Regions:
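Short amphipathic alpha-helix that is part of the acyltransferase structural core
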Residues: 1-41, 138, 149-180
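Short glycine-aromatic motifs
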Residues: 15, 55, 131-134, 193
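Conserved donor-binding loop and adjoining core beta-sheet/short helix segment
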Residues: 28-98, 200-211
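Soluble sensory domains of the PAS superfamily and closely related sensory modules
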Residues: 49-52, 107, 188-191
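Short beta-strand micro-motifs in enzyme catalytic cores
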Residues: 56-58, 79-81, 137-142, 194-196
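Short acidic/glycine-enriched loop/turn segments that link adjacent beta-strands
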Residues: 77-79, 121, 192
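Acyl-donor-binding surface of acyltransferase catalytic domains
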Residues: 87-153
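A mid-sequence, solvent-exposed acidic-amphipathic segment
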Residues: 172-210
Length: 211
């Protein structure tokens, strides 16, 4: 059974929720198994849901026991629906089935985007059987900056701002077909992003961008 989770309920089971978030086979994206995010960061993100009008924390119960938590958020302007937490201890297919039915009923006309690590095979396989298409397949890499050796400045790497954004757009537009963060949305929120572009012989070859 899927139902709204109160802040009191979440606080009572916060340790269990973090335990699930720390297991790559029982959680969705974004991952808390990367060695960077901490329990404090997890709790801070989860608690924000109870103060935001466009977020909900759902509680999943099965067999009379709490088995998971789903933090969902939506962007009405873009008709965009996704999750910041999808945590299930057991019965992942039941949880997904109930969540998809809930989303279909409450968010008609929205596009739903879900992310799961490949290790969560039960979730990935279930969504494939439901007709979901994988539109993005990424590696989750961790850079330990204190271990990096400085390298010489590369004049072919440029920082992107509004004045030279079209140089980055030439590259990004080749891959953005199904992305939420397409070139137009990135430009609109450019002050929140850091973008670095590598060029060779005047042609864009690759980019790093983060927020």
């Amino acid at each position: 059974m899927l139902r709204l989770c109160s802040k009191t309920e979440f606080e009572r089971h916060a340790d269990f929720a973090y335990e699930l978030a720390s297991d790559v086979t029982k959680s969705g994206y974004p991952t808390y198994c990367d060695g960077i995010k901490t329990k404090d960061m997890f709790l801070e993100r989860a608690r924000k849901a109870f103060a935001c009008e466009e977020e909900q924390m759902l509680l999943f119960e099965s067999g009379g026991r709490i088995q998971g938590f789903i933090l969902m958020y939506w962007l009405p302007k873009d008709r965009y629906l996704s999750t910041s937490l999808f945590l299930t201890n057991t019965e992942i297919e039941e949880a997904l089935s109930e969540f998809l039915a809930y989303a279909k009923d409450k968010f008609k006309g929205y596009d739903l985007f879900l992310g799961f690590p490949a290790e969560n095979q039960l979730a990935v396989n279930y969504l494939e059987r439901q007709g979901f298409a994988c539109i993005e397949d990424d590696y989750n890499n961790t850079a330990y900056l204190e271990q990096l050796a400085p390298v010489a400045d590369n004049k072919e790497v440029v920082k992107i701002g509004k004045e030279n954004y079209t140089r980055f757009q030439l590259l990004h537009s080749q891959f953005e077909e199904n992305m939420y963060w397409n070139s137009a949305r990135l430009y609109e929120k450019l002050e929140n992003w850091s973008i670095f572009l590598e060029e060779k012989d005047g042609e864009p070859r690759g980019a790093v961008y983060y927020t």
